[in-house]
């Protein structure tokens, strides 16, 4: 949008995403970099079975995604479920409900389109096309366009990272600031959430208390900036009619007032007499 000269959003908030996956590589990054593109296509892509909606589609199945998430921290998940069992015995309803709510969201996964998944692996985690300035995407006309974050100027940028994020490592999301070189420093903000993992910046107490208030304030600041920039234009427009009125009044005042000739007035007076 910015490269085409179109209007861009007031603000852009990027959270826990691998803008530059080379920084602080995690287990996810290492897997993507150490396996070939063909390996992913041959080992994690399957077709939807015939008795399910979308039968025959090639996908990265949700159950494999879930298994991968759990395998990253098996001890932590085992302890969480053990604590859940103890809380049930103690009758700690609040802790039990918090556990259920978290895992209801954590376990909710969807099959991912194969082409989308494989392209993401190659573009983001293997070839780093965005940071190398070599990423092309198709526009609505089917024509390739280069992605140029350096063309963004009027959109404020906020990035959010979790201190303990083991999926998108430290600095991977903040790298967006280095790419968006034309955004003024006053319109940039970075937040690192202390003690938060990847999911912590999106949900739960840390999201409610540490992340959401700042994101909300950042968006409101962008709206206020727009209103402030629009104010002079509004004032000049409202002043225009008043200027026209003043000009009209000036012309009226300058126009000579019609007066009767003294001779004609005297003649009329004589006739009346």
Give the positions of each predicted feature:
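Short, conserved loop/helix-junction motifs that constitute active-site signature segments
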Residues: 5-7, 149-153, 180-185
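Alpha/beta-hydrolase-fold enzymes
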Residues: 2-115
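Conserved alpha/beta-hydrolase "acid-adjacent" motif
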Residues: 166-175
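C-terminal alpha-helix
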Residues: 214-225
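Short beta-strand/loop motif that positions the catalytic acidic residue
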Residues: 152-153, 158-161, 165
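Catalytic histidine-centered segment of alpha/beta-hydrolase-like enzymes
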Residues: 167, 190-210
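Active-site nucleophile elbow and catalytic-triad environment of alpha/beta-hydrolase enzymes
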Residues: 124-149
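Intrinsically disordered, polybasic Lys/Arg-rich low-complexity tracts
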Residues: 225-273
């Amino acid at each position: 949008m910015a490269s085409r000269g179109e209007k861009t959003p007031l603000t852009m908030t990027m959270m826990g995403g691998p803008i530059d996956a080379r920084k602080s590589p995690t287990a996810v990054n290492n897997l993507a970099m150490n396996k070939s593109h063909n390996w992913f296509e041959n080992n994690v892509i399957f077709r939807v079975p015939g008795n399910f909606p979308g039968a025959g589609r090639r996908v990265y199945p949700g159950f494999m995604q879930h298994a991968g998430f759990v395998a990253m921290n098996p001890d932590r998940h085992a302890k969480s479920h053990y604590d859940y069992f103890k809380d049930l015995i103690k009758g700690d309803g609040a802790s039990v409900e918090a556990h259920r709510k978290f895992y209801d969201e954590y376990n909710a996964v969807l099959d991912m389109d194969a082409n989308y998944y494989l392209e993401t692996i190659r573009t983001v985690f293997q070839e780093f096309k965005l940071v190398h300035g070599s990423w092309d995407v198709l526009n609505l006309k089917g024509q390739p366009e280069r992605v140029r974050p350096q063309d963004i100027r009027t959109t404020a940028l906020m990035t959010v990272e979790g201190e303990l994020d083991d999926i998108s490592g430290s600095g991977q999301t903040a790298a967006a600031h280095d790419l968006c070189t034309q955004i003024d420093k006053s319109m940039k903000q970075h937040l690192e959430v202390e003690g938060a993992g990847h999911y912590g910046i999106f949900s739960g107490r840390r999201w409610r208390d540490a992340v959401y208030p700042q994101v909300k304030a950042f968006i409101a600041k962008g709206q206020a900036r727009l209103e402030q920039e629009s104010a002079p234009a509004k004032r000049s427009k409202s002043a225009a009619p008043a200027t026209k009125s003043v000009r009209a009044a000036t012309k009226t005042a300058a126009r000579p007032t019609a007066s009767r000739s003294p001779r004609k007035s005297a003649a009329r007076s004589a006739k009346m007499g």
